[in-house]
Structures are given as C-alpha cells and as structure tokens.
Amino acid sequence: MNNLKLDIVEQDDKAIVRVQGDIDAYNSSELKEQLRNFISTTSKKKIVLDLSSVSYMDSAGLGTLVVILKDAKINGKEFILSSLKESISRILKLTHLDKIFKITDTVEEA
C-alpha cells in the first residue's frame, strides 16, 4: 500500500485495526481488499477501525468505508470508527455518513 499501514490487534470481543497514513484513491482499493478479507475470516464480532493516525481521506476512502460497513453487516459483525481527527470527522458530518457509522472517541469506548 502506498504509505498506508495496517496493524491488527485482537483483544476480547473485538479486533482493532489501526490505520496509519492517508486513505485516498491511490490506496483505498488495497485497503478495501485487506479489510474485506480480514472481516470474512476473523471470529471477532466487533471490528474497530482506529483512525487516529489518518489525517486525510478523499471520496474513494469514504466509499471504501461504506463498502466495509456493508461487508461487516453481511458477516454479522459490528463496524466501528474510532479516534477520528477533526478533519475526518468534519468530512463524515458534511456527507452525513456520521449518521450511518457508529463512531467512538476512543478505541476503549468501542
């Protein structure tokens, strides 16, 4: 992935996916593929996407999040966005996507 890194930690009933780097048209399809594969194979019921290290996301990134949310629901899992920077939070609010995602301030709250 172009300057995008994923670290996955499974704890208790959830899997925490820490994303580092920007989510944009250059890397969103690879991010989508990796998350879809993970969601379909993990036994954890909660998937928490820790976005604390993501400062930029474009429309391709938003589309990827929507696809992952749908995949999670199909697989009987809860998909949670966590630790959003103000710039990402603002984009989600402007597009009204904050209404369809569960969003927490911290990973621990998820």
From Swiss-Prot:
Q: How is it modified after translation?
A: Phosphorylated on a serine residue.
Q: Which residues carry this modification: Phosphoserine?
A: S59
* Gene3D superfamilies tied to this protein: STAS domain
Family, similarity comment: Belongs to the anti-sigma-factor antagonist family.
State the InterPro entries in the record: Anti-sigma_ant (IPR003658), STAS_dom (IPR002645), STAS_dom_sf (IPR036513)
Q: Which organism is it from?
A: Thermotoga maritima (strain ATCC 43589 / DSM 3109 / JCM 10099 / NBRC 100826 / MSB8)
What protein am I looking at? Putative anti-sigma factor antagonist TM_1442
Query: So what does this one do?
Result: In the phosphorylated form it could act as an anti-anti-sigma factor that counteracts an anti-sigma factor and thus releases a sigma factor from inhibition.
Asked if the Swiss-Prot or TrEMBL record annotates the protein with the keyword GTP-binding, the reply is: no
Q: Name one Pfam family in it.
A: STAS
- Kindly list the GO molecular function terms attached to this UniProt entry: anti-sigma factor antagonist activity
Which of UniProt's keywords are assigned here? Phosphoprotein
Describe the location of the STAS domain by residue ranges.
Answer: 4-110
